[in-house]
Amino acid sequence: LNDYPEMIEGNLSHNAGKALSLTNLHWGLHGWAIYSSLGLCFAYASYNKKKAFRVSSLLGPSVENNAPLAASIDIIAILTTVIGIATSLGLGASQINGGLDYVFNIKINEFIIIVFITILGLISVCLGLDLGIKRLSQLNMFIAVGLLLLILILGPTIFILNAMVQNAGLYLNQFIQLSTWTEAYNNSVYQNGYTLFYFTWWFAWAPFVSLFIARISYGRSIKEFVIGVLFVPSLIVFIWMGVFGNAAIYQVLNNIGDIGAAVSSNASTALFVLYDSMILTKVLSIISLILIVTFFVTSSDSGDLCRDT
């Protein structure tokens, strides 16, 4: 929050509330609205209008009947998919490397980590949608729920639950304000450095995530689709960020550990620094490393499937 104009130096409780509101802005309804709206367009065009699963199919006959233009648009969509996944793989490799170094004092070239994740993704894709991608995704969610419950139980449980209720109120109260804030009266660089970065990332992932969502949503009504793609993921993100975010904030407010310094110096190790003040530190770290790998493998799988389409 160093670049955020409404930060009050020394007022940790105020800044903590703002931090979670901005986190929910960057990872909540706004981002999933991008996926749900584009995914609904893909689903309607493909299942109701019998068009191909391509971005160009959404732009009307004038584009569809112009083969060079349609091909150019589809190529751009593929390139944005590759760039979006590459950015995520790079950040994921950095966190995996940081975790291995911090917890086990093992240093691995990040390129090797990316190659390893890519190979796992290719194996999963070759096994098919049901045998590979579906089962890996189910394993991924099982591990994620288990880790979330462990942090909630091992961390400051009452504080986390109380804070999440307050976070919900702050987010809903500031929803319109945050959605329309353009820094018109500030000379800060927060929006360019954070909000625009996150939303650009959402848009880069939009073609393949939306197409993937449409492919697995056959037979759903529009109402079911919107609930399942917009509201359910946003709620899951709110819970996830609330549990992990407030566990970290509790440590900062009570001068426990060095997570604040870790975020400032090397953000890739911050998650593992959080675990230092909990029991089962090594277990939590190992589970997190496995989860990071499976998250990025499933993301790569989805991208590969949609690029093939």
Predicted regions and their residues:
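Short alpha-helical interface patches
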Residues: 56-60, 223-224, 229
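Membrane-embedded translocation segments of transport machinery
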Residues: 67-69, 77-220, 227, 232-286
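Transmembrane-helix bundle segments that line or gate the permeation/cavity pathway
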Residues: 1-98, 102, 155, 159
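Transmembrane alpha-helical segments in integral membrane proteins
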Residues: 28-54, 125-128, 203-222, 287-308
